[in-house]
A protein has these predicted regions:
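Short loop/turn motifs that connect adjacent beta-strands in outer-membrane beta-barrel proteins
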Residues: 22-29, 68-75, 122-129, 194-199, ...
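Short glycine/proline- and aromatic-enriched beta-strand/turn motifs that initiate or cap beta-hairpins
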Residues: 21-62
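Outer-membrane beta-barrel "beta-signal"
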Residues: 226-245
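Extracellular loop and loop/strand-boundary signature of outer-membrane beta-barrel proteins
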Residues: 44-50, 98-105, 172-176, 217-224
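Transmembrane beta-strands of outer-membrane beta-barrel proteins
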Residues: 30-36, 73-79, 111-113, 130-138, ...
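Outer-membrane beta-barrel translocator domains and adjoining extracellular loop/strand segments
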Residues: 44-49, 89-96, 144-153, 213-219
């Protein structure tokens, strides 16, 4: 936990430093707009649970402050407030390694706030620019929903009837999330096309959660239960105050 906190704090201070450490040609430009995309999420469980990606939406508001251009790099900080659906979807196999008709998925709805440094290379006013994103991400779970099939294969283990699963991990069933606050590090790359009517942006991101959705003490069933996410996002931004390009 201490190591995870150090990593998160490093990402936060890296993003803030990009905002205030101005040593190049200064800029002072706000850009505001909307974003939307798709999230592919798994939960990294220990012990492991076989999974497919849980596909869900991610969408919200974006604010970007461009602070300087330094040796050709366009430096900015980007903050978003998003609705994000995470969770997991199980690939269910029996203790005999047979694929079962059972289905199970968990949907977790978050308010997500990434705070990212943006380093771009390319055109500022009109044309294309490539960029890198990196920084911390905070999220808060609003609700979680459990969906399971009517077919639910069970067997007897030590006189107890429980779901038939390949490695016997069943503690997640019926267990509500215990840690609503989620934090971690997000990074990605993208491309931006700037026109006279705004910025059109596409980016791909990877999020590595440093917190767990379930408690992880020695007495708890899971030592780890962290979000692990791929995201593809589309964003439209308009400069404020607006100026004709």
């Amino acid at each position: 936990m201490l190591k995870a906190t150090h990593i998160f704090c490093f990402g936060f201070f890296f993003a803030i430093n990009c905002l205030f450490a101005q040593v190049g040609d200064q800029r002072s430009q706000w850009s505001l707009g909307l974003n939307g995309g798709v999230s592919l999420n798994k939960i990294l469980f220990t012990p492991n649970i076989r999974q497919f990606y849980q596909i869900g939406p991610v969408a919200g508001l974006t604010a970007r402050y461009t602070s300087e251009k330094y040796y050709g790099l366009i430096c900015a900080i980007q903050i978003e407030t998003n609705y994000w659906r995470a969770g997991w979807k199980e690939d269910i196999v029996s203790s005999n390694a047979l694929t079962l008709p059972d289905t199970y998925q968990r949907k977790i709805d978050y308010i997500q706030v990434p705070i990212m440094a943006s380093l771009g290379l390319g055109e500022e006013q009109r044309g294309f620019k490539g960029f890198l994103l990196s920084g911390p991400q905070l999220s808060y779970a609003l609700r979680d929903e459990e969906l399971r099939s009517s077919t639910w294969t069970t067997h007897e283990v030590n006189g107890e009837v429980q779901p038939n699963r390949a490695n016997g991990v069943v503690a997640q069933y019926g267990k509500s999330i215990e840690n609503h606050l989620d934090y971690g590090i997000v990074g990605g790359l993208g491309a931006e096309f700037t026109t006279g009517i705004g910025h059109f942006i596409v980016d791909a991101r990877y999020y590595y959660g440093l917190s767990d959705i379930f408690h992880n003490a020695k007495k708890d069933p899971f030592a780890k239960s962290a979000n692990n996410t791929l995201m593809l996002k589309f964003t439209y931004l308009l400069d404020f105050p607006w100026r004709k390009k």
